[in-house]
Amino acid sequence: MLALISPAKTLDYESTLPTDKHTLPRLLDQSQALIDYCRSLSASEIASLMSVSEKIAKLNAERFQDWTSELTLANARQAIFAFKGDVYTGLDAYHLQENDFEFAQKHLRMLSGLYGLLRPLDLMMPYRLEMGTKLHNSRGHNLYEFWDDRITRLINEDLEQTNSKILVNIASDEYYKSVKEQKINAQIVKPVFLDQKNGKYKVISFYAKKARGLMARFIIENKLENAEDLKAFNSEGYYFDLENSNQHELVFKRDEQA
């Protein structure tokens, strides 16, 4: 089993790292090409392109200039600890055990606008470059065209190396769109998380993001290999909804708290 999650805009480069074990991203030459494009942008152009404030644009212009492919623990940190959004609150990587990291390194992947596909212990410098960014480049007008099938090929390599027959899509639509689904050499399963509100079950973004992280943690802690085992997921009140699920989409519901 190989699980895909999205990165986060919020980053943490302050907390004490629980391990110094690390690896390097495998598509750094592609990252360098993207950085070269980004370095040509002014802060105001970045603000317009990314729809961010001038302050955030200036910070990221500086990050693009400072970026290097010579990654070390002195200038970077492992992706699983660097990301800090709702998904990573659910994942809670800082409280995983040593053997969990070994499993995660083989069975969890983070999609990334800048790095393409990250393993948990791959080092990364702070950046902001969302997959949906319409960054003009030599391969097209956006990052989907830039990455083309490179991310997909690497996913297939990982599936083969881990003898995985299942790809679990717990990434956002924006990031999963970078995967050429028809070229994936595995059964694809997508967990969907519905929360009850005013008597109706629906996807509530904040809860769904955290639930994706909880599912990633569930897979890692239980060393899951089969899609059937995902149905046992019951973190924080979620339960499997057999009636509304099928072999491609597993629905999990959580009832409204009184």
Curated annotation (Swiss-Prot):
Protein name: UPF0246 protein ACIAD2218
Family: Belongs to the UPF0246 family.
Organism: Acinetobacter baylyi (strain ATCC 33305 / BD413 / ADP1)
InterPro entries associated with the record: YaaA (IPR005583)
GO cellular component: cytosol
Highest taxon, organism lineage: Bacteria
Pfam families listed in its UniProt record: H2O2_YaaD (PF03883)
A single BP term in Gene Ontology: response to hydroperoxide
